[in-house]
């Protein structure tokens, strides 16, 4: 429903581009002369527009001057259009699009996309927005969908309000500026462009980017809608300048033809005298019918070349803009009343109807009094506006109050007059009865008509409710499809991640097997070393036994020697006493000599004992060093003990053997020293200090050799221990890594399991909401039946009231006294009755005509009622089919999900992928995930962007001279890449051209439904294409 109409002119703005390189090399002159902000002089003639932009104007200045306000208008419920017109290579595409991802060179379309969401985020949080976009081109006078290249020849239809729209065009729901730019990138890749002598990226079609915004206040349920058409027209071409030939020439013919049709439409609207405007001459003018003279606020850019080479084309473009400036549009807010507003309006009309019925009843009562011959006083008459109908009736039934002349007549004539009066009274009563019957019939027909209207209103409400339910179910169905697609994508990515993890696990298993093999080799080496050590220990045991036997023999010899020395020392005199005195003296001398020798030997033994003490002290130092080494060995053994107990036992045995070996070595050295002393004593029996020193040196050398062998053995053992410890550390690190990876995989599996449970809970919640919706529908149906019964009761009471009033009027007419006046009074009564009869006859005829008209209208109303009932049945059938389709899809998706779940349980768990795009509402006060200073986020640099390099070079110079604005800094992180010059003809195709968008507004209607029926059935999907 539209209201708040206001008339406005088309806003026309003129923009001149800089001279390009070819024009500079050719020596073309710069012909425009700018005067102020709204006028330009070409060839001495001034041209005035709403705004004129010189070549050094930046994209931001152009946007703030013309397009920023139209965003607010569209969000306020108006329709808007911005389109660029001009010669080829005049900068139209640069003005409308520019470089999409360059914050300084982006055009009107990407800036509008950013500004729409900035406004929405700052609005009331009770508002909810649904934004959908379409992108199509008019190529060779055929409408081609740029978001689905399979749709190459779409048709233009009209909705129930006779507003043109493109039927079957793909519509995408968006919720962020990035999504709008993605749609533009996708459409631009499919648009027709070519290379001409005047432009490297010449548009070969008219492109139209449509933004449809619907907003609803959640609290008041008030709904507004607005459409914004962003049109980039192809430029008019002169073949002699562009050098077009072949397919490019055919494109130029169609472009010039459609632009000529646009010029004819603007000329007809500018003159204002022609009753026919040729909108249907071109599909472009047909689509833009509302933008040119209709319900829209339109802004037109006329882009011009400043070169003297294009003087004629520039003047023609300026004249076109001046004609367009005189066109008047009537813009109105697209407001849809809520149920509460409809109810208030219905109550207001009901009160008005009630007041009118009361006035009619009073006027009928007053009229009946006048008809009965009563003179109603002015105090009892209806006054003011309420008595307008009674005054009209009174004017038609004047009362004759002329002279009172008394005339005497004969009794026969008197009787004749009385009979005539009775006859007339009888006719009057018959007419009154007939009038009452007709009035009752009229009331019945009016009541039936009111009932039909109420039924029609209720049917319309039910129809709208069913349509809303159907659209809601369709949106839920789309959301369910998106969710299932999301789950399928996540599960597919999960399967891929599982395969990757399986490969990694296999690699780790191979590495672990290699390490196990290496460890087995080390263990085998260690076992061989242990067997070698055991063999050496056995050899050492044999050697120790042999040394023990030698030492025992030496001990026995030493004891015998000591015994012999002792006995000889004691028994020698006894033996000598029985011999000769001389021999005794010799023996005594010999004994004394032996004593002295023994003394020297004892002295030497004492020296040797001192030397032995010193050796014991050195051995204790060595023992302490050995103890520290043994402590270090025990520490390493404690580390090795965690790996194997067997290694500890081996090391412990090794340590005991080393200690036994050291003690035996010390004992052997001591015994060898005593043996040496004994041999020296037996051989020489003379003091030999030099031999003692040699024995001492031999002992020290032997001790040093033992010490070096012991240190070498300790160093070898330390090296082996270090190698084993390093191997143990490496195995521990590998085991820890494998354990961490296993824990990570288990955590991912638990997370996916939780997500699956959440999805199941959400599905149960949706099922519960659907059941509650069905219950509410049944309750509403019962309430409607109750209201219908109450209305029937009121209707019956009204009939009884009308019959009672009619009866009372008849009784009051019968109770009136008969007039017994004279002949004059009788003549007056006769005249009065004749006039009344004539008036009643007229009223009767009028009532008969009204009755006939009502009878004629009754079949039409019944037909409309039947059509409404059939439409309601069709809607119910469509709703039922949609529910059945949704249930089938749900079962099929559930089966697919169960199958994939089984496959995932069979394999393993993975990571969840990114979500698919969902058509969701935009709520003010909730900013997107991207930073406010970087609303476009990180975008792919491969997006195709066609722009005029002249504007880029010229504005780069201008921007170097002037500081960048806040808006340019606002998008400092965005980027764009330009495309190299194309070949002579380029036609970009979409990779997934055969894919159908899930938000496509095509619906599977039954056969025979035309555009109007579709618009009534699906008002949310078939919106007006007004700009």
UniProtKB/Swiss-Prot annotation:
Keyword set includes Isomerase: yes
Major subcellular site: cytoplasm
GO cellular component: axon cytoplasm; ciliary rootlet; cytoplasm; dendrite cytoplasm; kinesin complex; microtubule; neuron projection; neuronal cell body
Chain residue ranges for the region called Globular: 907-1027
Protein family (similarity comment): Belongs to the TRAFAC class myosin-kinesin ATPase superfamily. Kinesin family. Kinesin subfamily.
Domain statement: Composed of three structural domains: a large globular N-terminal domain which is responsible for the motor activity of kinesin (it hydrolyzes ATP and binds microtubule), a central alpha-helical coiled coil domain that mediates the heavy chain dimerization; and a small globular C-terminal domain which interacts with other proteins (such as the kinesin light chains), vesicles and membranous organelles.
One Pfam family per UniProt: Kinesin
Catalytic activity: ATP + H2O + a kinesin associated with a microtubule at position (n) = ADP + phosphate a kinesin associated with a microtubule at position (n+1, toward the plus end)
Post-translational modification Phosphothreonine, affected residues: 397
Renumbered residue ranges of the record's region Interaction with BICD2: 353-1027
Binding residue positions for ATP: 86-93
N-acetylalanine: residues carrying this PTM: 2
Record-linked SMART domains: KISc
InterPro entries: Kinesin-like_fam, Kinesin_motor_CS, Kinesin_motor_dom, Kinesin_motor_dom_sf, P-loop_NTPase
Stretches assigned to coiled coil: 331-906
Record lineage: Eukaryota, Metazoa, Chordata, Craniata, Vertebrata
Gene3D superfamilies the record matches: 6.10.250.1590, Kinesin motor domain
Keyword list, A-Z: Acetylation, ATP-binding, Coiled coil, Cytoplasm, Cytoskeleton, Hydrolase, Isomerase, Microtubule, Motor protein, Nucleotide-binding, Phosphoprotein
EC number(s) stated in the UniProt entry for this protein: 5.6.1.3
Organism for this UniProt entry: Mus musculus (Mouse)
Null mutant phenotype: Death shortly after birth. Neuron-specific deletion within the first 3 weeks after birth is lethal in 75% of animals. Surviving animals show accumulation of neurofilament proteins in neuronal soma, age-dependent sensory neuron degeneration, loss of large caliber axons, and hind limb paralysis with a stronger effect on sensory neurons compared with motor neurons.
Role summary: Microtubule-dependent motor required for slow axonal transport of neurofilament proteins (NFH, NFM and NFL). Can induce formation of neurite-like membrane protrusions in non-neuronal cells in a ZFYVE27-dependent manner. The ZFYVE27-KIF5A complex contributes to the vesicular transport of VAPA, VAPB, SURF4, RAB11A, RAB11B and RTN3 proteins in neurons. Required for anterograde axonal transportation of MAPK8IP3/JIP3 which is essential for MAPK8IP3/JIP3 function in axon elongation.
Region entry Necessary for interaction with ZFYVE27, spans: 271-361
The protein's name in its UniProt record: Kinesin heavy chain isoform 5A
EC category name: isomerase
Gene symbol of the encoding locus: Kif5a
């Amino acid at each position: 429903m539209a209201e708040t109409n206001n008339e406005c002119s088309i806003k026309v703005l003129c923009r001149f581009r800089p001279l390009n390189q070819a024009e500079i090399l050719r020596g073309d002159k710069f012909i425009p002369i700018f005067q102020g902000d709204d006028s330009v002089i070409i060839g001495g003639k001034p041209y005035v527009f709403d705004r004129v932009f010189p070549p050094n104007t930046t994209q931001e200045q152009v946007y703030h001057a013309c397009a920023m306000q139209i965003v607010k208008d569209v969000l306020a419920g108006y329709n808007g259009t911005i389109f660029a017109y001009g010669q080829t290579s005049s900068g139209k595409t640069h003005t409308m699009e520019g470089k999409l991802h360059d914050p300084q060179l982006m055009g009107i379309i990407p800036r509008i996309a950013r500004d729409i969401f900035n406004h929405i985020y700052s609005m009331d949080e009770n508002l909810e927005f649904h934004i959908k976009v379409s992108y199509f081109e008019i190529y060779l006078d055929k409408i081609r969908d740029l978001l689905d290249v399979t749709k190459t020849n779409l048709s233009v239809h009209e909705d129930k309000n006779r507003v043109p729209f493109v039927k079957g065009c793909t519509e995408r729901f968006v919720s962020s500026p990035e999504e709008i730019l993605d749609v533009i990138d996708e459409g631009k890749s499919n648009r027709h462009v070519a290379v001409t002598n005047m432009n490297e990226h010449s548009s070969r079609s008219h492109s139209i980017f449509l933004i449809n915004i619907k907003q609803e206040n959640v609290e008041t349920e008030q709904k507004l809608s607005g459409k914004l058409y962003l049109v980039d027209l192809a430029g008019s071409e002169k073949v002699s300048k562009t050098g077009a030939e072949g397919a490019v020439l055919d494109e130029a013919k169609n472009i010039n033809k459609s632009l000529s049709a646009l010029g004819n439409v603007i000329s007809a609207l500018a003159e204002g005298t022609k009753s026919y405007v040729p909108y249907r001459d071109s599909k472009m003018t047909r689509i833009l019918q509302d933008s040119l003279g209709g319900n829209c606020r339109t802004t037109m850019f006329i882009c011009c070349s400043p070169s003297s080479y294009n003087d004629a084309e520039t003047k023609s473009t300026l004249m076109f803009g001046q004609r367009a400036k005189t066109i008047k549009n009537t813009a109105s807010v697209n407001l849809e009343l809520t149920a509460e507003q409809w109810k208030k309006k219905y109550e207001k009309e009901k009160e008005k109807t009630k007041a009118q019925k009361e006035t009619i009843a009073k006027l009928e009562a007053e009229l009946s009094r006048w008809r009965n011959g009563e003179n109603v006083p002015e105090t009892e008459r209806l006054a003011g506006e309420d008595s307008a109908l009674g005054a009209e009736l009174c004017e038609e039934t004047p009362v004759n109050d002329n002279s009172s002349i008394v005339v005497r007549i004969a009794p026969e004539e008197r009787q004749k007059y009385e009979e005539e009066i009775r006859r007339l009274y009888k006719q009057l009563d018959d007419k009154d009865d007939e009038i009452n019957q007709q009035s009752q019939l009229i009331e019945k027909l009016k009541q039936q008509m009111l009932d039909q209207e109420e039924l029609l209103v209720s049917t319309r409400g039910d129809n709208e409710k069913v349509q809303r339910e159907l659209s809601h179910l369709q949106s839920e169905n789309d959301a369910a499809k998106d969710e299932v697609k999301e789950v399928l994508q996540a599960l597919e990515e999960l399967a891929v991640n599982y395969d990757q993890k399986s490969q990694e696990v296999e690699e780790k298993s191979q590495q672990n097997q290699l390490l196990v093999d290496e460890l087995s080799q080390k263990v085998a080496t260690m076992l061989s070393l242990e067997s070698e050590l055991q063999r050496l220990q056995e050899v050492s045991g044999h050697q120790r036994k042999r040394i023990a036997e030698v030492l025992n023999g030496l001990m026995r010899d030493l004891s015998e020697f000591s015994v012999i020395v002792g006995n000889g020392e004691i028994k020698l005199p006894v033996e000598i006493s029985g011999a000769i005195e001389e021999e005794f003296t010799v023996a005594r001398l010999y004994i004394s000599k032996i004593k002295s020798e023994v003394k020297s030997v004892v002295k030497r033994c004492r020296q040797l004992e001192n030397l032995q003490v010193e050796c014991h002290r050195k051995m204790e130092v060595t023992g302490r060093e050995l103890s520290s080494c043994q402590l270090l060995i025990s520490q390493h053994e404690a580390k090795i003990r965690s790996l194997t107990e067997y290694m500890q036992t081996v090391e412990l045995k090794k340590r005991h053997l080393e200690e036994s070996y050291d003690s035996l070595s010390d004992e052997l050295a001591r015994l060898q020293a005593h043996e040496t002393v004994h041999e020296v004593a037996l051989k020489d029996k003379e003091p030999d200090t030099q031999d003692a020193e040699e024995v001492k040196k031999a002992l020290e050398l032997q001790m040093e050799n033992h010490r070096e062998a012991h240190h070498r053995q300790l160093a070898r053992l330390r090296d082996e221990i270090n190698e084993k410890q390093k191997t143990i550390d490496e195995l521990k690190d590998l085991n820890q890594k494998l354990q961490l990876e296993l824990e990570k995989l288990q955590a991912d599996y638990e997370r996916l399991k939780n997500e699956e449970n959440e999805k199941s809970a959400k599905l149960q919640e949706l099922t519960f909401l659907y059941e509650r919706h069905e219950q509410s529908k049944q309750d509403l149906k019962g309430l409607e039946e109750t209201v219908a019964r109450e209305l029937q009761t009121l209707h019956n009471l009204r009939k009884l009231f009308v019959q009672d009033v009619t009866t009372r009027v008849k009784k009051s007419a019968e109770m009136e006294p008969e007039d017994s006046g004279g002949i004059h009074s009788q003549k007056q009564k006769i005249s009065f009755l004749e006039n009344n009869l004539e008036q009643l006859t007229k009223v009767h005829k009028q009532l008969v005509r009204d009755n006939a008209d009502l009878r004629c209208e009754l079949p039409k109303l019944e037909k409309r009622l039947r059509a409404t009932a059939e439409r309601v049945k069709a809607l119910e059938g469509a709703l039922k089919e949609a529910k059945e389709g949704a249930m089938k899809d749900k079962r099929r998706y559930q089966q697919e999900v169960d199958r994939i779940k089984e496959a995932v349980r069979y394999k393993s768990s993975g990571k969840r992928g990114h979500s698919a795009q969902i058509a969701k509402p935009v709520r003010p006060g909730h900013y997107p995930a991207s930073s406010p200073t970087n609303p476009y986020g990180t975008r792919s640099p491969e997006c195709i962007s066609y722009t005029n390099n002249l504007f880029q070079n010229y504005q780069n110079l201008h921007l170097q001279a002037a500081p960048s604005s806040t808006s340019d800094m606002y998008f400092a992180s965005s980027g764009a890449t330009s495309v190299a010059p194309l070949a002579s003809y380029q036609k970009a195709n979409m990779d997934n051209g055969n894919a159908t968008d899930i938000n496509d507004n095509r619906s599977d209607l039954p056969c025979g439904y035309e555009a109007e029926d579709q618009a009534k059935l699906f008002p949310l999907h078939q919106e007006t294409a007004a700009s």
